[in-house]
Amino acid sequence: MGCRPRGPRGQAERAGSRCQYHWPMTNRSRSFNVPDKPSLDGIEAKWVDVWDESGVYHFDRSKSREEIFAIDTPPPTVSGSLHIGHVFSYTHTDTVARFQRMNGKSVFYPMGWDDNGLPTERRVQNYYGVRCDPSIPYDPDFTPPEKPDPKNQVPISRRNFIELCERLTVEDEKVFESIWRRLGLSVDWRYTYATIDDKSRAVAQRAFLRNLARGEAYMAEAPTLWDVTFRTAVAQAELEDRERPGAYHKVAFHRDGGDPIIIATTRPELLPACVALVAHPDDERYQSLFGTTVRSPLFGVEVPVVAHRLADPEKGTGIAMICTFGDVTDVTWWRELKLPTRAIIGWDGRIVADPPEGLDSEEGRAAYAKLAGATVHTARQRIVEMLRESGDLIGEPEKITHPVKFFEKGDKPLEIVTTRQWYIRNGGRDPELREALLKRGQELDWYPEHMRTRFEHWVGGLNGDWLISRQRFFGVPFPVWYPLDDKGNPIYDSPILPDESQLPVDPSSQAPEGYTEDQRGKPGGFIGDPDVMDTWATSSLTPQIAGGWESDPDLFERVFPMDLRPQGQDIIRTWLFSTVVRSHFEHDCLPWKKAAISGWILDPDRKKMSKSKGNVVTPLSMLEKYSSDAVRYWAASGRLGTDTALDEKQMKIGRRLAIKILNASKFALSVAGEDTVADPAAVTEPLDRSMLAVLAEVVQDATAAFHEYDHTRALERTERFFWNLCDDYLELVKARAYDPESREGASARAALLIALSVLHRLFAPFLPFVTEEVWSWWQDGSVHVAKWPSVEEFRAAAEAGDPAVLAATSEVLHTVRKAKSEAKLSMRAEVERVTVHGKQAEQARLCRDDLAAAGRVTTLVFETTDDAELRVDVELAPAEK
């Protein structure tokens, strides 16, 4: 299904950039500039500067949509430092960007910073030792404490707090960018955005206003998941279960003329909030109670006994109390059974001072007074003791461990309080919309495919709409004001909205049209909506922000829908799903064609690495110790969707590989010389053609792997061939290649240059620095805009070759080397006689001279038999006496 653009369209200035594609297989004369002692030292800074100056990674927006590959780059959260997990997943994306660029695509590869929201606020609070208090007036001369104390934070105005957030995020972003550049990300930094900048705020506010106009966004006063530490609402997607100790308390409810009814609860402090008891309609034990009432202990409130299918006969005593609100099941029961509300927990997580409606008895109010003002934990302790004294606690609490819901960034269990919030419909209460969004998930190409299931499970399990408002400070404000009646009360049903041309707006500091600032907060005047958008409400619009939706229609038409969304598996339910929702509403299509999902980085104990767990490793030390290419090698060795351990051994291997590329390239170029032409027609020898035949298979496999978003397979295949080339082929042809006069020598030299050019380009997406360095020794331009290798470049020579020739010849050479090694002889030691037996002996015979020279063999005998296994007998030369 195509996208349907909404809203006005205009003209935008078109800015193009140079993008060259270089064919290395030419007959041009050239000079080599090979250093005497190649080294990795200094090449990163050197090439980062060159790439910046040349604009080699600039997006060419003059290209048509078919010629563009657009990436919806994840904007990392700017709240401290990057960790090695970021390097892991962003390297995956960069290999794709580089491959597509070498395939002739103009790559739209922007970078964003997710710099608004709670993580930034927490960092600012701890870094400067401050906290936001909106009741404090702005101080234009405020300076943060010289010695910040996170435990004794200085209260400051909202405006002062936001200024500190802006100041610190700018500094953090500079550090992030320097690390990304050092890693070699081929980002076009001209297209950088921040989720709190004016462009992002305008996009977020515009999308919200359109959602509101179409009925996709709405305000409701309802039970809300609430973090009492941060005093903000929390969405379903931000929850996590944590195992916590608790206890089942058996509590007696009383009824006239009958035995008490025993319920079991982990939250006895909610007894004053009890509005009913509930059991399963098929539970025979409680059939006679349905439709009757019982009295709550201590408080004496009459509550009905009701039936509902969600009651679990196997849990506790099979009958439970419904409180407003202990958990989301309470909310479901309250809503479906149309029960009253008796809220007792405030926004601060303490028991509110006034007893709830219905608690009328003197004894009940006296009992409640003992709880008022207490934290939930303290109230629980007090009420258990009160129940014990009254005889309504049956037995002692039974200790258990059970899952408790937390805000993913919070330290205390969530509560449910009634608040007024903004929501966007997401299918949680609309089966038709749910099916439409599930269909979007089916339209999307997932890499790996099994990640689709996580999306479907999340959408299928939604139990409410997406809560997008937050009671915080540093975020995108809702573009809404409310008129005040003659008593100064907000008229929420008649919001005042800005025109899109006025965006972005800040209702906390700007007056709406038709009002003046001195009418703020006064009867007959107005107030601004005090809340900000959840950070995902902005991040869900990254394709629109980066692509210039409405602000740059020409660019947007060229990049949207984007080609790829790369991201982590843990934010499928948040970032990926929310972006699908916004695009479905605004454009009636997916925001991208493909999703590439990275796995997690694990610490040495195989635990997920995360800032909250304190087990993260920052990348800078690894980059300095091993080099950027080495760290990229480790990252690229991890497949999409697969959890990967931080492994410095892999980085050491990557560094060794980069050094080997330097040295092998120097050797090959010194052997080939400047007069050699990389001409496939000059490749005439069986071993050379065989090597190119194997290389052709590598090119085909690596190319197919990249098209399937399997960068690891492309790297493994390329690396395996490279080491075989260095260990076997180079040794086999070394003597012949040094012969300047013979056709056989020219064949080896031409084959070497062809292989070198192809390998440099195959390695380029993974090891950008070392490949650019060696490419510059003998080629014009950048390897990163050179054409991705194709078998067509050397097809004639490859098709004339038999891969079995190189395999058989290499095996013979391995056996000869092994014999020398076991005899503790130098590899230059003479060999008297080598006899080769088996079906492959004939292939090895074709390379007799190369084998004799490489193995220093005096006599070579080939005996072709029907044996499938190649057998090699080695007779070493007699030791000198």
Swiss-Prot record:
Residue numbers spanned by region Disordered: 493-526
UniProt KW Ligase keyword: yes
Keywords of the record: Aminoacyl-tRNA synthetase, ATP-binding, Cytoplasm, Ligase, Nucleotide-binding, Protein biosynthesis
Subunit annotation: Monomer.
Group of enzyme by EC: ligase
E.C. number(s) listed in UniProt: 6.1.1.9
Enzymatic reactions: tRNA(Val) + L-valine + ATP = L-valyl-tRNA(Val) + AMP + diphosphate
InterPro entries recorded: aa-tRNA-synth_I_CS, aa-tRNA-synth_Ia, Anticodon_Ia_Val, M/V/L/I-tRNA-synth_anticd-bd, Rossmann-like_a/b/a_fold, tRNAsynth_Ia_anticodon-bd, Val/Leu/Ile-tRNA-synth_edit, Valine-tRNA_ligase_type_2
A GO MF term: aminoacyl-tRNA deacylase activity
Role of this protein: Catalyzes the attachment of valine to tRNA(Val). As ValRS can inadvertently accommodate and process structurally similar amino acids such as threonine, to avoid such errors, it has a 'posttransfer' editing activity that hydrolyzes mischarged Thr-tRNA(Val) in a tRNA-dependent manner.
UniProt keyword Cytoplasm present: yes
CDD domains the record matches: Anticodon_Ia_Val
This protein's GO CC annotations: cytosol
One of the GO biological process terms: valyl-tRNA aminoacylation
Family (UniProt): Belongs to the class-I aminoacyl-tRNA synthetase family. ValS type 2 subfamily.
Localization of this protein: Cytoplasm
Name of the protein described by the UniProt record: Valine--tRNA ligase
Ligand binding (ATP): K611
Motif stretch ('HIGH' region): 76-86
